[in-house]
From Swiss-Prot:
It catalyses: RNA(n) + a ribonucleoside 5'-triphosphate = RNA(n+1) + diphosphate. NCBIfam families: rpoZ. Its EC number is 2.7.7.6. This is DNA-directed RNA polymerase subunit omega.
Length: 68
């Protein structure tokens, strides 16, 4: 079974699996708690984590480094 978006494509957007999971989990939690419908016009996934991963793949959700 193929998953969308693929992990390979997602790692082109966020270079670390740990960071990818953290960003997706935080966004999914926010969507759930705030009843946020998301920033994309439509989603393939019905679940919050899937929607967050789709937003990362679309470039709508990015990781900002606060390194100084």
């Amino acid at each position: 079974m193929m998953l969308y978006p693929s992990i390979d494509n997602l790692l082109l957007k966020i270079d670390s699996k740990y960071s990818l999971v953290t960003v997706a989990a935080k966004r999914a939690r926010y969507m759930q708690l705030e009843n946020d419908k998301g920033v994309l016009p439509s989603y393939q996934s019905d679940k919050f984590v899937g929607k967050a991963l789709e937003e990362i793949h679309a470039g709508k959700l990015v990781l900002q480094n606060d390194d100084k």
